[in-house]
Every structure is written in C-alpha cells, then in structure tokens.
Amino acid sequence: MTHHTHKPLMAAWVAIALAVLAGILRTSQARINGAFAQEIHDAFLSGVISFGSGFLILLVIISFNKKGQQGWRQLMVAIRSGGITPWFTLAGTAGAAYVLSQTLVVGLTGVALYTVAFVAGLSMGGLFLDLWGVGPAGKKPLSFNRVGGAVLGIGAVALSLVGHSTAVSALLPLLLPLVCGVLVAWQDAANGRMTVIAGTPLTSTFLNFMVGTGVLLIATAFHSFSAGLPAALPTQPYFYLGGAIGVVFIGITAVVVREIGVLLMGLGSIAGQLLMAVILDFFFPSAQVTGVMILIGASLAFVAAAWAAWPKKKPHAHVAEPPADA
C-alpha cells in the first residue's frame, strides 16, 4: 500500500480545531435528521432527503469546478492502475449507514447517548485503522495509551447506560451507532487517501454523496413498498439542512485526516460531538432526558479518546561523548 508524502497544509492546532468543528457539525446533523425522521415518521425518507440534498449541492459545485473535475480523472486513473484500492470508492456506504442510524436511533435515545456510543466506535476504529496504516498518515503502532483509551471508551458507553433499561430491546439501538463509528473511521481514512490522490477534498466528498445517495435510494424504495410514503413533508427549513452540514464536515475530515491521522482527527471530532450533544439535549431535550450518568459517560468518552491519542514518551537516546584528541 503506497503512502504519499506531503507538506503540511496547516499547523496541527488548526487541524485539531477543524476536527472539533467537524464534530460539532456531525452532532448537529444527527439531531436535525433524528427530528426530521420523527416529524414524518419515516427514517428512510428523511435519510435519503438529507444525503440527496448534499449530493445535489456537490453536483452543482463540481460541475463548475475544474479542480474537482481534474481530481475525479486522477482518482479514476489511480483506481485503474491499482494506485488505490477500489473499495475506498465505497466509503459513501458508511456515510449512508451513519445518516440512517441518526434517523433511526436519535429519537429513541437522545443525541447525547447516541453520540457516546458512536464515538466509542470511532475511537476503536481509529485505533486499528492507524495500526494497519489505512489512512494517509501511515501506520501507527499499538501502545498502552491507545489500547487503554479504546477499552475506556467502551466503559463510557456502559456507564452512560446506568439508569436505563438493560433489556435487549433497549440496548440494541445503540449497537447501530457503535458499528457506524467504526465504519465512519474507515470512511474518514478512505476519504483522506482519495483526497491525497485527487488533490482536492471536493472529489472524495462528491463520490461519498453519490454512492451514499444511491444506497439510500434503494433502501428507501424497498421500505416504501411496505410502509408507504408520508402524506406531506414539513415546511420548516431547518429540517433540510442535514445534507449541507454533511458536505462541510466530510470535506473537513478529508483534509484534516491526512494532517494528523485517523485517531487524532477522531479525538478532535469527539470533543466537538460530545460538547454539542450535551448542549443540544440540555437546551432542546428530546425523548430521553440527559441524566448525570450520561454526562459522566460523555466526559469519560472524551478522556478515553484523549488518552488514546496522547503521545508516547520516547526514551532519551544516550549519545556517547567523542573521544578526546590525543
């Protein structure tokens, strides 16, 4: 697997700040899509409207953007020549699963508990993807900090469930954001690799939305055969912002992941996600109240990610004194 070397595009603190912003946007999208699904009582249709609107935005942009079109040609050449695995082009399926999980789960659990489960998966995914060198930043070996952080992230999910029903039917919805966290970590790594080849995040973002929209259209078509379609759609404009928000945060992560790696990018994203999740559930409570244990679990999830990303101290190498001149 070939890794491309590149000059840093930005300072590390700028990349981390952008990752935090991406996390804030992720949670905002989750809350909007979850509310949209509840409003129309159709998680599949709300998901395809969210993803499809993002695809239409990008289709217009790339139609007038020569760099994006050139990036598309470069990416196709790389796929045909074996310069990048074709599986990376399916990263949009992870995005589709993520959006669908928002519309299915957030209304049941609240955005804070959903986010704790999601970021636990994101941390574990980032850990192993960096170990395997899937992202553009190359391989990062296992360490005590990284393994401990991943285990602590799972503990954060368990802690957040204290006071909630432990029935299988109540816990099952949280498996979806947990798995989607792992998938999105892979999506971020794949997008980073494709962005390096294309020379612009526009190409990988467009491909994500094209593939994801296709997947959701097929799923929605099958679902509508049995459940039908809503009689009407809501008129509030904010329900339709999910796609535009997704365009922004996927573009950000495609750039940032090549600068600081999958796990560190995930750390910044997790900080933003947890912060926004608690704020949204506090000021705009949903079906589930954000209790003390969820707040503690959210804090623990952030500590877990920080621990996993904390750099390992390198032992000081002993430098022998040169022999004195005779």
What are these regions (language model features)?
Residues A19, G23, G47, T89-A96, ...:
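Small-residue-rich segments of transmembrane alpha-helices in multi-pass membrane proteins
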Residues V14-L18, A43-N65, W87, V151-L152, ...:
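Hydrophobic alpha-helical transmembrane segments of multi-pass integral membrane proteins
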Residues A15-A19, Q70-A97, N145, L172-L178, ...:
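Loop-to-transmembrane-helix transition segments
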Residues M1-V20, L127-V182, L295-A326:
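Juxtamembrane helix-loop boundary signature in multi-pass membrane transporters
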Residues A30-H41, Q74-L75, L104-V105, A158-A170, ...:
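Membrane-interface helix termini and inter-helical loops of multi-pass transporters
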Residues A112-G121, L202-V211, V248-D281:
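Helix-helix packing/entry segments at the starts of transmembrane helices
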Residues I61-A78, G125-G138, W186-I197, V248-I260, ...:
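C-terminal ends of transmembrane helices
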Residues S28-H41, L100-T109, V134, A189-A198, ...:
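Juxtamembrane C-cap of transmembrane helices in multi-pass membrane transport proteins
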